[in-house]
Amino acid sequence: MTLSTNHVYPVIWHNGAVSLIDQTRLPNEYTFVEIHRSEDMARAIKTMIVRGAPAIGVAAAYGMYLGAREIETSDRHEFLQNLDKVAQLLGSTRPTAVNLFWAISRMMKVAKETLGTVEDIKQTLFQTAQAINVEDLQTCQAIGDNGLTVLPASPEKLTLLTHCNAGALATAGYGTALGVVRSAWREGRLERLFADETRPRLQGAKLTAWECVQEGIPVTLITDNMAAHCMKQGLIHAVVVGADRIAANGDTANKIGTYSVAIAAKAHNIPFFVAAPLSTVDFELADGSKIPIEERDPTEIYQVGDTILTPEGVDFYNPAFDVTPAELITAIITENGAIAPGELVKLQLKQLV
C-alpha cells in the first residue's frame, strides 16, 4: 500500500512488525509503538494505543498473524488449537467493537480452510491481514464519497458536527465520519467542522482536532454540553458520527454521548448520519438492546494527569458507549451507499466475504 503524506495511517506493517501510532500520546507527541507479539497487540487494543472499531479490526487481524507466527508446531490440529487461544486473547480486549470479532472470525476461517502445511497457513494469514488493511482504506474512501450524496443540498458550504474520533486514526486511513468530512472538504462543500471534545478521554479534542489541523480543515472545538446550543443558534447543518456496532435494525452503539447529540439533532430537525463499514453491522443482533457496553476504569473520569478532580467518597459510572435508536438516525452511510436504518438488512448479503 502506498502511503500518502496527506493522510494518517494508524496501523502499518513494517519490517516484520506492526507499527501503531500511539494515540494515547496525541496531540502532544506523534510517536509509534512497534508490536511483535500477539500479547502486545492485545495490550495495545485494551489500553487504546490503537482505537476505533475499524482500526481495531485491522490491528486484530495482524495480531492473529503475529500469534500464528509464534506457534512452533508443524501439526495442523495443534496449530489451530493454539491459534484459537490467540483469538480468545484478542477477543477479550474490547467487547463493544464488532469489527474486532469480525476480523478475528475471518482470520480463523481462513486458517481452517487453507490447505497445505502450517507454514502455508501462516503465509495465508499474513496475506489476509494485509488484505483487511487495504480493504478498510478503500471502504473508508467509498464511505466518504457516498456521504456526499446525502448531505443537505444547501447551503453550498456546510458546517458539520461530529462526536469522538471516527477519522483516519480510527480506521486504516481516511476515516468514516471524518471520511465524509474529508470528501466534503475536497469537493468544496465544507465550511467548518464542529468537534465535540468527547469526555472522558477527549478523543474529539485530542484526535479529531489534531487530524483536521494536519490537513488544514477548519475545526472548532466545543465541549460536549454545547452541542444543543450550537444547533439552536443555527451553527450546525448536519451531524456525522461513526459506529462501533450497529444492530440489524439500525440501532447504533458509538462513543458515550452520541445518543445525547442524536436527541438534540432530532429536536432541531438536523439530519443525523452514521458512517460505518458493513463490517460494523452485527446482523445477529435484532436490535441494540443486546449490544455489550464496555465499562472502563473510573480514573478516566476523575483524574487528569496527576490531578484528582473529585472529593473522596464519590462513586463513578463510566460506560464507554451508548446506543442511539434507529429512529433518530437519518441514514447509515456505508461503502455500498447511504440507506435508511430500516433498509439495512437488505445489504446483509453484501457483507459476506
Swiss-Prot record:
Gene Ontology biological process: L-methionine salvage from methylthioadenosine
One Pfam family it belongs to: IF-2B
Site (Transition state stabilizer): 164
Catalyses which reaction(s): 5-(methylsulfanyl)-alpha-D-ribose 1-phosphate = 5-(methylsulfanyl)-D-ribulose 1-phosphate
Domain of life: Bacteria
Keyword Acetylation on entry: no
Pathway membership: Amino-acid biosynthesis; L-methionine biosynthesis via salvage pathway; L-methionine from S-methyl-5-thio-alpha-D-ribose 1-phosphate: step 1/6
Broad EC category: isomerase
Binding site for substrate: 51-53, 94, 203, 254-255
Keywords recorded for this protein, A-Z: Amino-acid biosynthesis, Isomerase, Methionine biosynthesis
Keyword Isomerase among UniProt keywords: yes
Gene3D superfamilies documented for this protein: translation initiation factor eif-2b, domain 1, Translation initiation factor eif-2b, domain 2
Active site per database record: 244
InterPro entries per UniProt: IF-2B-related, IF-M1Pi, IF_2B-like_C, Initiation_fac_2B_a/b/d, M1Pi_N, NagB/RpiA_transferase-like
EC id: 5.3.1.23
UniProt GO MF annotations: S-methyl-5-thioribose-1-phosphate isomerase activity
Entry function: Catalyzes the interconversion of methylthioribose-1-phosphate (MTR-1-P) into methylthioribulose-1-phosphate (MTRu-1-P).
NCBIfam families cross-referenced by the UniProt entry: eIF-2B_rel (TIGR00524), PRK05720.1 (NF004326), salvage_mtnA (TIGR00512)
HAMAP family: Salvage_MtnA
Family to which this protein belongs: Belongs to the eIF-2B alpha/beta/delta subunits family. MtnA subfamily.
Identification of the protein by name: Methylthioribose-1-phosphate isomerase
